[in-house]
């Protein structure tokens, strides 16, 4: 079940491969995500010291958050993947034009996972073309549905 989807990622990038990564979260972040208080539209993944980090995602703390901690809504969060997957991703990202973007947050076995995509940025004309195709598919479906 998806918690948050990054629909903008599919508009701005053409996603070629998907990977599921674990997230290192604090307790208040998990509670806030359960309440639907997360945003990953501006998020991206960086590689530091052969580790992946999620930057730019915003998880708003609940008003009932503990008083003895100071929640940082946009802190850098570590992504957990197998070392073979990380080395494969590093090799691909070092190629020209590839980037890693968060696609969604979801639960798997009671834990929050982040689906990241290996993507290439779309040019403006590619975005327009994708939009035209989507509109035509919608129109086609509408025409097929309508009686007469």
Swiss-Prot record:
Keywords annotated in UniProt: Cytoplasm, RNA-binding
Alphabetical GO biological process terms: trans-translation
Main location, first listed in the record: cytoplasm
Bias-annotated ranges (Basic and acidic residues): 126-142
One GO molecular-function entry: RNA binding
Any one cellular-component term (Gene Ontology): cytosol
The keyword Lyase is assigned to this record: no
Record localization: Cytoplasm
InterPro entries with a match to the protein in the record: SmpB, SsrA-bd_prot, SsrA-bd_prot_CS
Record region (Disordered): 119-148
RNA-binding found in the keyword field: yes
Known function: Required for rescue of stalled ribosomes mediated by trans-translation. Binds to transfer-messenger RNA (tmRNA), required for stable association of tmRNA with ribosomes. tmRNA and SmpB together mimic tRNA shape, replacing the anticodon stem-loop with SmpB. tmRNA is encoded by the ssrA gene; the 2 termini fold to resemble tRNA(Ala) and it encodes a 'tag peptide', a short internal open reading frame. During trans-translation Ala-aminoacylated tmRNA acts like a tRNA, entering the A-site of stalled ribosomes, displacing the stalled mRNA.
UniProt similarity note: Belongs to the SmpB family.
Protein name: SsrA-binding protein
């Amino acid at each position: 079940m998806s918690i948050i989807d990054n629909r903008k990622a599919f508009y701005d990038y053409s996603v070629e491969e998907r990977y599921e990564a674990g997230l290192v979260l604090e307790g208040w972040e998990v509670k806030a995500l359960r309440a639907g208080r997360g945003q990953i539209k501006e998020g991206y993944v960086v590689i530091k010291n052969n580790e992946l980090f999620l930057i730019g995602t915003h998880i708003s703390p609940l008003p009932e958050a503990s008083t003895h901690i100071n929640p940082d809504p946009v802190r850098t969060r570590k992504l957990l993947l197998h070392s073979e997957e990380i080395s494969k991703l590093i090799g691909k990202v070092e190629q020209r034009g590839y980037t890693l973007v968060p696609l969604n947050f979801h639960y798997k076995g009671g834990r929050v996972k982040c689906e990241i995509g290996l993507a290439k940025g779309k040019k403006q004309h590619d975005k327009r073309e994708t939009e035209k195709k989507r509109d035509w598919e919608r129109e086609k479906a509408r025409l097929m549905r309508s009686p007469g």
